[in-house]
């Protein structure tokens, strides 16, 4: 199951990128996936995303994402939702571009008041693009960044269990129950 990480933070070497890489590692371990992944860090493409015609770098990023079986999409929480940079990139994708993919939403946030943004905003975007989103998104508080290895495990286990139905040899892509779209976000730190 090839894994592609999409990071929608407008800053290079962001905390969002660090969290996404750690989350991808945790999912890879928990699900027993082959090591290796591609990362699309949108801050590198930012100046190209609003051009009328996509640059070769943007086309390559789109190709990586649309060819992926598993897409981990990470964004900081900005103004209560995912970044505009992430939205601009996904607006470039054709309708139903993620029809064959399983997506995992993740957001990094300053405070618990935004914990629901991952499933209230990012999950519907991924579902609109056709992705299966069978596991709860992860809302990571900045205050928990120092203990990522300890807190990613339970969530990665949930994701791994959800991915079992999508492994090669399983009888087709299952229909997602309504609960898969309404699952509460897994959140690190204090209760909401």
Question: Where are the predicted features?
Answer:
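Structured loop/turn residues at beta-strand edges in well-structured enzyme cores
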Residues: 66, 96-98
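A glycine- and small-aliphatic-rich helix-loop capping segment at beta-alpha/alpha-beta transitions
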Residues: 88-95, 124-127
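Short, glycine-/small-residue-rich phosphate/pyrophosphate-handling segment
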Residues: 103-154
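Hydrophobic alpha-helical membrane-association signature
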Residues: 19-23, 118, 155
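A short helix->loop->beta-strand "cap" motif at the edges of active sites that frequently abuts
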Residues: 34, 98-102, 131
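Glycine-rich phosphate/pyrophosphate-binding loop and the adjoining helix
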Residues: 134-192
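N-terminal beta1-alpha1-beta2 submodule of the flavodoxin-like/Rossmannoid cofactor-binding fold
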Residues: 1-91, 175-192
